Amino acid sequence: MNKLNEPTPRRNFLTNSVKGTLTLGVGMSTLASLLQSFTFAEDEDSGLLLQGAGAVTTEAQFRAAVAGPVNTSMMSSQLAVAQATNPYAKQFAGFELEETKGMISILKDLGTTPPPPDAKAQAMMTQMKAATGAAFDKAYITAQLQTHQLLQTLTQGYLASPAPAKTNMMEMHGRHIATLALATIKEHVAITQRLSTVVGS
C-alpha cells in the first residue's frame, strides 16, 4: 500500500492543535484589504521576496499573507502527485499536499479564504501543466523552493515583530503556531534545494 499520502501523527497533531487553539475568539477581519497591502518582486539571488513583510505584526495579518502561497503550493502538489516522474519529487509532493490541505482547512476554519491565484501563480501552473517528465519535475521543485522561501520570509518577519502581551492568548497562540511552522518551512527549503540539484538533470 502506498503510504505517501497517509496523514502522519505529526500532521494530525499540528492540524488539531491549531484548530483547537486559534479558533478561540476569532472574528471576521478585513483580510481582503490586508492582502492588497503586500506586493511581490523578483530577486536575482533568492527568487521571490515579499515587499512589506515587516508589516505582518498580528496573527490575522499572518494568516492573510500566507494563504495565497499555501494554496499555490497545494495546487502544484496535487498536479505533481499525478505527474511527477522522479520518485523523490513525487514523494515530496505527497507530503506537501497533505500538509497544505491541513493548513488550508485551518485557515478556512479561522475565516481566511485563500485568494484566487495571482498572475505569477497562474503562469507557474501553466508552465507545469505544459511540461512532462524531467522538465515537469524541475519546474515543480523550483516552484516549491521559491514558495517556501517566500513563506520563510513571511514567517520570520512576523516572528521578528514586537511580541504581544502575554495576556493576549490569540496572538500568543498565533506566534506559537508560526514558530512550529517555521521549522517545517526551513526543512522544506533545505529539501527542495537538494532536490533541485538532482531533478531534471
Regions found by a protein language model. Name each.
Residues 40-201:
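His/Met- and acidic-residue-enriched segments that coordinate or traffic transition-metal cofactors
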Residues 1-15, 19-36:
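N-terminal secretory signal peptides
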